[in-house]
Every structure is written in structure tokens, then in C-alpha cells.
């Protein structure tokens, strides 16, 4: 951790919170001039940091601690009956790991997903520049996991492969395939891939109890939360 002590971090000015509309948020960023080293990234993920584009960040709010880092310990995960049904329902899909890049196929799917699922969010309206800045980064540890049915792209799970686990950066999927629960299936697949790679955990980002879009993460049990700088099992 001595290397981490030499890193520089910067805090943003307070701004409107993307998740809790009545709150002001402050974000702590790793110095953008710092090269994106996978081992530093892994250490920072243990401290609750996430990646967005070229930046590693975590919430740093003065008057709110609602954003709680969450991860799934893969070796302890026990799928529920509903989750087992989701896995079976999607057993006809093939998964392929691709290098992050821009394509019209990716963007068309991303655009439909944002327009139909997140039209009330700060990522609407989607644009090609936004997609590229957010997700298409030339990083050796980043993957686009493509989920296809007979060649048709149904979902993309943008995932970072770290020494300590997989970081689920973002998943977008076909909104018209609601029956498949593709967002949930992507997480279940990432848990399985973590086990296949002999890694420890899937890092899911932030659990926010009072935000419907973010509290789904407790459906995966057991789940660990970073509380007072310690990872603890949520009971």
C-alpha cells in the first residue's frame, strides 16, 4: 500500500447527485495523469473506487454516505431458484470476449437501452461521443463480453479483469427481451467467469438503499459491503 500513499487525488466541486435528487455529491478522482495501472486499480477497488472512462473515482460526499461499495464473493455465492431459472433461460446464448471498440452494432443496442430504460437519467440522450468516452477505452484489462443468440447481439457486459476479481463496469442490453432478464444474467455470468478464472469477487459498484436503480444488488447473496473501510457481509 506504500505505492498508494504516493498517489494524488482530486475532489470535484459539489454537484447534483445522479441517484438521490435532493442531495449534493462530491467525487474523488485519482490524478488523471497517473497511468491506469491494473494493480493500482485493483488496490483502489478494494477501497471502493470504480472506473468510468479513463478515470478512477469514488463518492466523497460531506453530508451523505448512501453510496456503499458492493461486491459478490464468488466462491460463496449461492444462486436463488429465480436466478437458476434465469441461467437456464439464457443457456442458448453464446458469450464472446472482444476488445473494446466502437461499432454501429454496439451503439445501436446502447442507444435503444438508454432510450427505453434510462430516459430519465443523466446519460440521456445517448450519443456516439458519450458511448466512446464512457466505455471505449484502450485498456489491456478491459473486455466487451458479447451475449449473442444465433449471431444477434443481445447484451454487452463491459468488464475489467483485475488481479482480485472482475469489475462490472456497465452492461447494456436489448430492452425488448425483458423475459430473459439480461442484466441479471450478465451478473450471474460474471460470477461464473470469476470462478472459472480462479478470482475472488465481482465488484458491482455502489449499493444505494433508497435508489431503486441501485438497490437490486442485494438480490445476489451473499454480498459484501465496504463499511468503515472493512468489507462485511450484508445480513
Swiss-Prot record:
Its EC number is 2.3.2.29. Its main location: cytoplasm. It is found in: Cytoplasm. One of its GO terms (cellular component) is cytoplasm. It is an enzyme of class 2 (transferase). SUPFAM superfamilies: Acyl-CoA N-acyltransferases (Nat). One of its GO terms (biological process) is ubiquitin-dependent protein catabolic process via the N-end rule pathway. It comes from the Bacteria. Pfam families: ATE_C, ATE_N. It catalyses: N-terminal L-glutamyl-[protein] + L-leucyl-tRNA(Leu) = N-terminal L-leucyl-L-glutamyl-[protein] + tRNA(Leu) + H(+); N-terminal L-aspartyl-[protein] + L-leucyl-tRNA(Leu) = N-terminal L-leucyl-L-aspartyl-[protein] + tRNA(Leu) + H(+). The keyword Nucleotide-binding does not apply. Keywords: Acyltransferase, Cytoplasm, Transferase. NCBIfam families: PRK01305.1-1, PRK01305.1-3, PRK01305.2-2, PRK01305.2-3. Belongs to the R-transferase family. Bpt subfamily. Functions in the N-end rule pathway of protein degradation where it conjugates Leu from its aminoacyl-tRNA to the N-termini of proteins containing an N-terminal aspartate or glutamate. This is Aspartate/glutamate leucyltransferase. It comes from Pseudomonas fluorescens (strain ATCC BAA-477 / NRRL B-23932 / Pf-5).
Amino acid at each position: 500500500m506504500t505505492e498508494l500513499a504516493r498517489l494524488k487525488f482530486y475532489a470535484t466541486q459539489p454537484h447534483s447527485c445522479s441517484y438521490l435528487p435532493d442531495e449534493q455529491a462530491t467525487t474523488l478522482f485519482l490524478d488523471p495523469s497517473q497511468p491506469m495501472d491494473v494493480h493500482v486499480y485493483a488496490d483502489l477497488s478494494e477501497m471502493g473506487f470504480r472506473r468510468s472512462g479513463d478515470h478512477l473515482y469514488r463518492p466523497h460526499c460531506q453530508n451523505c454516505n448512501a453510496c456503499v461499495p458492493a461486491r459478490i464473493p464468488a466462491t460463496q455465492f449461492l444462486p436463488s431458484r429465480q436466478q437458476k431459472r434465469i441461467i437456464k433461460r439464457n443457456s442458448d446464448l453464446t458469450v464472446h470476449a472482444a476488445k473494446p471498440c466502437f461499432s454501429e452494432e454496439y451503439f445501436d443496442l446502447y442507444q435503444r437501452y438508454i432510450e427505453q430504460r434510462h430516459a430519465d437519467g443523466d446519460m440521456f440522450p445517448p450519443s456516439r461521443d458519450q458511448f466512446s468516452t464512457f466505455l471505449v477505452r484502450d485498456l489491456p484489462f478491459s473486455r466487451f463480453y458479447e451475449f449473442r443468440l444465433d449471431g444477434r447481439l443481445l447484451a454487452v457486459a463491459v468488464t475489467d479483469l483485475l488481479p482480485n476479481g472482475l469489475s462490472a463496469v456497465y452492461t447494456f442490453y436489448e430492452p425488448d427481451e425483458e423475459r430473459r432478464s439480461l442484466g441479471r444474467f450478465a451478473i450471474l455470468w460474471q460470477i461464473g467467469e470469476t470462478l472459472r478464472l480462479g478470482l475472488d469477487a465481482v465488484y458491482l459498484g455502489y449499493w444505494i438503499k433508497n435508489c431503486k436503480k441501485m438497490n437490486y444488488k442485494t438480490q445476489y447473496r451473499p454480498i459484501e459491503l465496504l463499511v468503515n473501510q472493512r468489507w462485511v457481509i450484508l445480513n
